[in-house]
Amino acid sequence: MSRINTNVSSLIAQKTLRKTNGELQTTLKRLSTGLRINSGKDDPAGLIASENLRRDITSAKRAITNSERAGQLIATADSALSQVSNLLNDIRGLVVEAANTGVVSDEQIAANQLQVDSSLEAIDRIAQTTTFQGRTILDGSLDFLVSAGGTNGVGLDTVEDLKIDQANLGTSESIDVSISISNPATTAALSVDANGFTNNALNDDLVIKLSGTDGTEVFTFQQGATVDDLASAINLVSDATGVEATNNNGVLELATSAYGRSAFVDVEVISEGAAGTFGDNLSGTREIGTDIEAIVNGVRASGNGNSFSINTSTLDLAVTVDPGSNTAINFTIGGGGAIFQLGPDVVSNQQARIGIESLNTGQISGKEGRLYELRAGNGKDLYADPSGAARIVDEVITKV
């Protein structure tokens, strides 16, 4: 009988040893890395899910970091704005002091003007030197770029002020803005028709209290005072009441200088002689203005006087137009702004694109004018027009 010698037992033992060693290596690798899946052979489907999850976690961490850095940039800008606000309030105080010409000497006004100029230079310096990680943020380089584009590219000449806080420009890097004004803002107005006078003059003595947006005054007129006399007296203190008067062919018209529902005119006849007809021909005792009504890219805007604004997920802007204007406006936002990536996916709905306006005194302005006009030798310095200077500073303080 013949015998066949084999090494099957050894082969089986080697196979078992290799398997055991492989499992040991896998176990040691899992223990050392803390990961169940270290390669595709461990769990192909699980590896794909694991890598996707790791990608999402990494992206989310970066998004959180981006949000923190965006907050740091805003905090830097806010700190600079606080300094500018303090300087503007100092300028406002200097303007008020310089207006007290009854006791303030020319030398004191000159000293105040020098201090105003110094404060304006400080504001310009802040605008040019405020940086975040080497990038200047208040010089206008992060503002949106606006051009007379849109459907017709018209109406921008009627815009007194345009502020774009946020815009989603999408992949085209531009957005057309179309604005239609259905109802322009109006002033508050009252009138006394010609029947309230005889030959354009009062029939009897008259005392009235006139109240407007800015204050109240009491007027006393004698019999025979003309419509022009009444208008002149009212206009003499129009800055205190906010109401202006005109003689329109014998009709005394009273209207606020301000527009919108916050503007009002109120006339109370305190006393009038028996022969007087002023009160009987007054069109009313109180009237208020109306706010502008506008549609921006199909969205109804919120109106306030001659200003209106919208705040949507794709566009956040505020516009101020010429008083009473109803001209359609079309323009294009074609780039600019600071982009903040706030989500894990690089898509527009997970980004914020914010416009940061320039704080330069030659740029920042309101309907009354630009801040640089307060410098010595310009039209709104402390010598030429302290009242106008105060109005400009008030508007700029509101914007800042």
Which role does the model predict for each range below?
Residues M1-V400:
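Primary detection of the long, small/polar-rich alpha-helical "axial" segments characteristic
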